[in-house]
Amino acid sequence: KFKVNGNEKYSGTIQIGLKENDKNTFADVILANNKVNEKSLTGIGESAILDEGLLKKEDDHGVAYYFRGNVKNNNVLFADKNWKIVKINGDGSIKLVLDGVIDELSKYYEEDYAFSNSTIYKNLEKWYTNTLDSYGDYIAYYKYCNDYVLDDDNYLAYNRVITNKIPTYVCLGNLVNSRIGLLTVDEVSLAGGSTSENKKFYLYNEKITGAYYTMSGAMT
């Protein structure tokens, strides 16, 4: 949880699922049009400012494929909104992040660190109902990772990603069933983010002028 004062704008993520008997899935199209690179050009924890393409890493469901750096070919138009492809999940569904902002943000939490009880989740659910509900057949009911497990004097996610620089797609926190959520700090790091400002990776959004919100915990 990254706390800021006042209201900000933020972006949400959804998972595009599979329909039975589909022979050419969205994941198939992505893999057919992108070479899977063996390793990243920059170290994990460093800002990725070049197009590092598609890489692979294990997640909770199997082998996942993710984009990293200043990628240009991960754009998708869905539900009349522009999205960025974050990764192909191990189960074949696709994680998208909105390439824009959702207005009307309240603070991430009141007195609770749990995402499912947060004000931001209620706002995301409201936005989903008003904007994406009619596309529900294509959006997966997914287990999002809400990693707010304490580890000594900080949160496990902070120590793992910021201090030790070993981000993972395997959830070490609590899984939240939802059709919409936020990225984790692990996902931001693997996409090319770091503790330094990076304006040259695909998650950078000039419309977000305040703090980024994730589903991972951190002391402020």
Named regions from a protein language model:
Residues 22-220:
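Long, domain-scale functional regions
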